């Protein structure tokens, strides 16, 4: 079973997910995602 950090959802394709409400800008949002966790990416 996949164990995700508190506040994160998981299970799909063995990845954890979290929804953030932040202003749209792909480059800034990708940077934000990478800062949240190792290997994080905007999807």
From Swiss-Prot:
Domain C-type lectin: 1-43
Molecular function (Gene Ontology), one example: toxin activity
Subunit and interaction comment: Heterodimer of subunits alpha and beta; disulfide-linked.
Tissue specificity note: Expressed by the venom gland.
Residue runs in coiled coils: none
Cellular component annotations (GO), alphabetically ordered: extracellular region
Principal location class: secreted
Name this protein carries in UniProt: Snaclec lebecetin subunit beta
Compartment annotation: Secreted
Needed co-factor(s): Ca(2+)
Function: Binds to the platelet GPIb/IX/V receptor system and inhibits ristocetin-induced platelet aggregation in human platelet-rich plasma. Strongly inhibits platelet aggregation induced by ADP, calcium ionophore, thrombin and collagen. Does not inhibit U46619-induced platelet aggregation.
Annotated Gene3D superfamilies: Mannose-Binding Protein A, subunit A
Disulfide bonds: 4-16
Keywords, in A-Z order: Calcium, Cell adhesion impairing toxin, Disulfide bond, Glycoprotein, Hemostasis impairing toxin, Platelet aggregation inhibiting toxin, Secreted, Toxin
Family, similarity comment: Belongs to the snaclec family.
Changes after translation: Glycosylated.
Organism: Macrovipera lebetinus
